[in-house]
Swiss-Prot record:
PANTHER family: TESTIS-SPECIFIC Y-ENCODED PROTEIN. Residues 93-128 have a biased composition (Basic and acidic residues). Pfam families: NAP. The gene is TSPY26P. GO terms for biological process: nucleosome assembly. One of its GO terms (cellular component) is chromatin. Residues 1-131 are annotated as: Disordered. Belongs to the nucleosome assembly protein (NAP) family. This is Putative testis-specific Y-encoded-like protein 3. One of its GO terms (molecular function) is histone binding.
Length: 355
């Protein structure tokens, strides 16, 4: 029947193989029949509509490449199917080859990077070994080049500053307690006649510059007070309280030492208002090395000896005046002439240490 239909006019009027309808099983190759149904395949000798059991896996491959011989039209479709499959296989193979090339390139790129890192590590080790052999050298702190000695000095100053900050609360606490005891001591001393003049005259250094006239004026000294300004390093104030006397009008005479921001220590004193005819003669000698009166200390602001008097009163007489009051006999003092100032120089400049 297949041969008879091939020669009829209907067969000639049928569309070409590429335009065959999807439902026409006579024009579909074996591979398409398998994909559509999956239950069987067309045998080359079978007629239209006849199905046979599906062959095995090995036979399926041969069947996929063997076209149907019906009407001689399916032979042209089989090569097209095989060609599409071959192109897909070649495209997959080319993609795999490209991936392999990329992986190989990445491997070759990693190897030089590892070699560079190893080379850098080796250079760093060589530099460290060279520095260790060179020994101590200058420290580079930013833009400054400081040797180890200066670096240690900076650290010591930082520790000192930290100690000052830690000491300040303790100083304030015990300073209040100390001022309380000093107030009680002053109350008792002002009721002892001639206490301070006796202490001044018994002091081995201060007695050398007290004249008989100074002794008479110091007999009216009621109380002496030494107070530090805020902090021991900023300055100190000496306050002398007197009873009414025939020599001057002042009830209080103050001598103050203050450390300015520039680091210079300046002194300020109360001007003494002398009664008429009681003003002492010239107080300073020509060579500016000796003085005639203890009260000249209040008007002198440039002589080093004046700072020495302040140092002695602050650090020696004021902390414990009782020890000089109880000495007994007063030492011999210079009379009728110019009394020289003590030659001992304090270990540290005045105004920069605590009493």
């Amino acid at each position: 029947m297949a041969d008879k239909r091939a020669g009829t006019p209907e067969a000639a009027a049928r569309p070409p193989p590429g335009l065959a309808r999807e439902g026409d099983a006579r024009t579909v190759p074996a591979a398409r029949a398998r994909e559509a149904g999956g239950r069987g395949s067309l045998h080359p000798a079978a007629g239209p509509g006849t199905a046979f059991p599906s062959p095995g896996r090995g036979e399926a491959a041969s069947t996929a490449t063997t076209p149907s011989l019906e009407n001689g039209r399916v032979r042209d479709e089989a090569p097209e199917t095989c060609g599409a499959e071959g192109l897909g296989t070649r495209a997959g193979a080319s993609e795999k080859a490209e991936d392999a090339n990329k992986e190989e390139g990445a491997i070759f790129k990693k190897e030089p990077a590892e070699e560079v890192e190893k080379q850098q590590e080796g250079e760093e080790k060589q530099e460290v070994a060279a520095e260790a052999q060179e020994g101590p050298r200058l420290l580079n702190l930013g833009a400054l080049i400081v040797d180890p000695l200066e670096a240690i000095q900076w650290e010591a100053e930082a520790v000192s500053a930290q100690a000052d900050r830690a000491y300040l609360p303790l100083e304030r606490r015990f300073g209040r307690m100390h001022r309380l005891y000093l107030a009680r001591r002053s109350f008792i001393i002002q009721n002892i006649p001639g206490f301070w003049v006796t202490a001044f005259l018994n002091h081995p250094q201060l007695s050398a510059m007290i004249s008989p006239r100074d002794e008479d004026m110091l007999c009216y000294l009621m109380n002496l007070e030494v107070r530090e300004l805020r902090h021991s390093r900023t300055g100190c104030k000496f306050k002398f309280r007197f009873w009414s006397n025939p020599y001057f009008q002042n009830k209080v005479i103050v001598k103050e030492y203050e450390c300015r921001a520039s680091g210079r220590v300046v002194s300020i004193a109360t001007r003494i208002r002398w009664h008429w005819g009681q003003e002492p003669p010239a107080l300073v000698h020509r060579n500016r090395d000796t003085v005639r009166s203890f009260f000249s200390w209040f008007s002198q602001h440039s002589l080093p000896e004046a700072d020495r008097v302040a140092q002695i009163i602050k650090d020696d007489l004021w902390p414990n005046p009782l020890q000089y009051y109880l000495l007994g006999d007063r030492p011999c003092r210079a009379r009728g002439g110019l009394a020289r100032w003590p030659t001992e120089t304090p270990s540290r400049p005045y105004g920069f240490q605590s009493g």
